[in-house]
Amino acid sequence: MLRIYADLTKFGIVVFSVLAGLAGYATGFQIENPFDWKIFLETLLGIYFLSSGSLALNQVQDWKIDQKMPRTAKRPIPSGKIKPAAAGILSVGLLLVGMNMLFKLEPVAGWVGLFCVFLYNGPYTLWWKRRWVFAAVPGAIPGALPVTIGYAVANPDIFNSESLYLFLIMFLWQMPHFWVLAIRYKDDYAAGGIPTLPVALGMEKTMFQVGLYTLVYVGVALAAPMFVHASWMFVLLTFPFVFKVLQEFYRYYKSNGTERWLAFFMWLNVSMLVFIIIPVIDKWNFLFIHHN
């Protein structure tokens, strides 16, 4: 039963969302304020329930499409492990719990969470993904908002440079992340009728877009000192990951997307975590030293 629940809520993606929320909260938190474990844990739980509910609802919305795709046909609903109605009730319950927690913690965080769910389960799932080749671009907005939700609980000023940096890293990372998978499973997406880049425009144009967004992504990471406090630690830890991401993309590109996809994919994911965690460590190290 736990396995079905984990698959329905896409637990692996939820973990990324919670980690992003943690980074957002830690970046927005002011060291002069008393740290409250209750608020901290409720923030992570709120993001967990919201993400789980939204992703489960997405499977309810897409189960007929998932049924046509070999990669997704074994998901809980198309495989018959759980009824769509039961999954729908569970997803709504999770969403309500998550929204309630976030609104109680900080109304700004609640509104950002509500907008996130609306965008992901509304326009993206129901229209953009099914009709638009570049749906991954606006679809990356809700995927990047968990970090903003976490930030908002600690600091409701979500339009400052710190919050913007975290959002941009999460946003830009998603395009190469998704399109690498779209290349890998392009036959599945074609079977499901989803017009992804490799299905609709071919490999050459898709690889160009992957490369373009990868360059912008690492460019923003290198520009972090313009957005957040950054010291020698930033330089020491960021540059090797930037180099490795670009190196793996080059190898991936030279194979025309047929080899090295997993190495590039994994380094993208690891680098994203590094790029949002380094500013947190750097800021807290700086504040702690100067506070004492």
From Swiss-Prot:
Record key words, sorted: Cell inner membrane, Cell membrane, Heme biosynthesis, Membrane, Transferase, Transmembrane, Transmembrane helix
Domain of life (superkingdom): Bacteria
Pathway, per record: Porphyrin-containing compound metabolism; heme O biosynthesis; heme O from protoheme: step 1/1
Topology within the bilayer: Multi-pass membrane protein
Cellular compartments per GO CC: plasma membrane
Subcellular location field: Cell inner membrane
Example GO biological process: heme O biosynthetic process
Keyword Thylakoid: no
InterPro entries: Protohaem_IX_farnesylTrfase, UbiA_prenyltransferase, UbiA_prenylTrfase_CS, UbiA_sf
GO molecular function list: protoheme IX farnesyltransferase activity
Catalytic reaction annotation: heme b + (2E,6E)-farnesyl diphosphate + H2O = Fe(II)-heme o + diphosphate
Transmembrane segments: 11-31, 37-57, 85-105, 108-128, 133-153, 163-183, 199-219, 223-243, 261-281
Top EC class of this enzyme: transferase
Gene3D superfamilies reported for this sequence: UbiA prenyltransferase
Main location: membrane
EC number: 2.5.1.141
Other remarks in the entry: Carbon 2 of the heme B porphyrin ring is defined according to the Fischer nomenclature.
Function: Converts heme B (protoheme IX) to heme O by substitution of the vinyl group on carbon 2 of heme B porphyrin ring with a hydroxyethyl farnesyl side group.
Assigned protein family: Belongs to the UbiA prenyltransferase family. Protoheme IX farnesyltransferase subfamily.
Full protein name: Protoheme IX farnesyltransferase
Source organism per UniProt: Bdellovibrio bacteriovorus (strain ATCC 15356 / DSM 50701 / NCIMB 9529 / HD100)
GN (gene name): ctaB
